Amino acid sequence: CCVNCGQGNELDGLDERAKLSGASKLYIEDIVDDFCDNYIMPCVQAGAVYEHKYLLGTSMARPAIAKKLVEIARKENAVAICHGATGKGNDQIRFELGIKALAPDIKIIAPWRMTDVWTMQSRDDELAFCQAHGINLPFDASHSYSRDRNLWHISHEGLELEDPSNEPNYDDLLVMSTTPEKAPDKAEYVTMTFEKGVPKSINGEEMKVSDIIRKLNELGGKHGIGIIDIVENRVVGMKSRGVYETPGGTILY
């Protein structure tokens, strides 16, 4: 099961890759509007920020995904849900707490923590598996950042970012944005209306929240807004460096 939170063309080709990976059925569930209205907006209304900079793009999406996973598991009469989060990050906790809160009877399978039976222990191992099984990917090892994307943001980890002394290679890294140095020198002005902290229109044009975020992503991205490079604390006690692009969200905040 794959949940569409606004990943765009990252969903292309999933049917073929799922079949080649051994899946008998694939669900791609669109929850973009639910994600925006019921997960992003409450955080915006609360002014929620982690460690003074991070606008919680991944954190907000995981409960929404967990809810949909449980719905599909119930529909299929499944006894277990398997997720691909590693044993070092926050996602394993986010997914498993969400799943167990909604379906305490469902077993959770976490292959990355099952080192005695799961042979793939790195991104390189995964790339080798895909190559061996004819699974085409839209990137190679030289561009295999660990990324998480949805309508609100995209996060980047890995490769040169593993060494805190390295500057990010923004020319290869950025997806939604350009750097401020390459942004237009001319300012662009936006007028917005809000109702109880929820955006309702841009420049007099009423839109649903998801379309407002898309529009602000476009505007903010081309003006170099919302790029952060931070070392943050994970729940498991590790520190992790990440570069985040949140152009529309930064404008809203």
Predicted regions and their residues:
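Nucleotide-activated chemistry modules centered on ATP-dependent adenylation/adenylyltransferase
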Residues: 1-253
